[in-house]
Amino acid sequence: RYRKQGTTDWITVPTEKVEVTGGAFKTCLSGLEPETSYELVAYSDTDESPVTTVTTDIERALPNGGFEEWCTENNIIYPGVTRDEAFWGTGNTGASIAGEVLTDKTTDKRPGSSGQYAALLQSKLAGIAGIGKLAAGNLFIGKYLVTRGTNGIVGFGRPFTQRPTALRGWVKYNCGAITDVGTSQPTGVTINKGDPDNGMIYVAVGTWTPEEYGVCEKETTGDKMLGTDEVPICVDTRDKNTFFNPNSPAVIAYGEL
């Protein structure tokens, strides 16, 4: 049973929501208010535990989650007040070699939003040294690290001490038809010209370390470990072994749309 501290009525957790393993049991409480103290009691028949008090975390919004802050440095657009302070990263740095912008602000915001802007992501066929290469519009928590030839190395992740149960926001997706298909396709997937393109949103919480997830084996000069405590995961687009894996043992929670 549980109740908000200072109230008199207890709320009983339904039996089907209690998982029992031997002499231990656990449950997950939902719908609690942030920054609020609750009293908890465990019981079996007439036996009751002492009252335990817990306080829920603050409901933290992601920095620049409304995508109101943008800057331009060295002709590259970043979703932040400055490049170095940006919580979010994009592939704009790599696409700039071909003179393209994949992610930028737009005034086409969600009706009812208090801000001025939203983020606009667009996939484009970028021409680099006479070679056409599809660059997907993207936006991720982390930062763009370095370009190697026509490939990019990006850093995923930022420290986050809260224990979220969901990521909420608004998205509008205009689906186009695929016009160009490369020679390399994802395992188990067949893509043809004319197929509808797919957009994807995913969020993960984990315990990644730069020592394990921030090493780029294909780096031939300098330190191979490009990950840091601030941005621990390195994804080298030359190396499929570095691609994000939602089944990694470091992943605590994962969801996608």
Residue ranges and their predicted role:
Residues 39-43:
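Extracellular recognition modules
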Residues 50-164, 194-206, 213-257:
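Aromatic (Trp/Tyr/Phe) and Gly/Pro-enriched flexible surface segments
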Residues 11-22, 255-257:
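Solvent-exposed serine/threonine-rich low-complexity stretches and specific carbohydrate-binding patches
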Residues 1-15:
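Extracellular low-complexity, O-glycosylation-prone stalks/linkers
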Residues 23-27:
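Short strand-edge motifs at loop-to-beta-strand transitions and within beta-strands
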Residues 29-36:
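Surface-exposed, short loops/turns at beta-strand junctions within beta-sandwich domains
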Residues 173-180, 192-196, 209-212:
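Extended, low-complexity, turn-rich repeat/linker tracts enriched in Gly/Pro/Ser/Thr and Asp/Glu
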Residues 67, 155-180, 187-189:
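Extra-cytoplasmic beta-strand recognition segments
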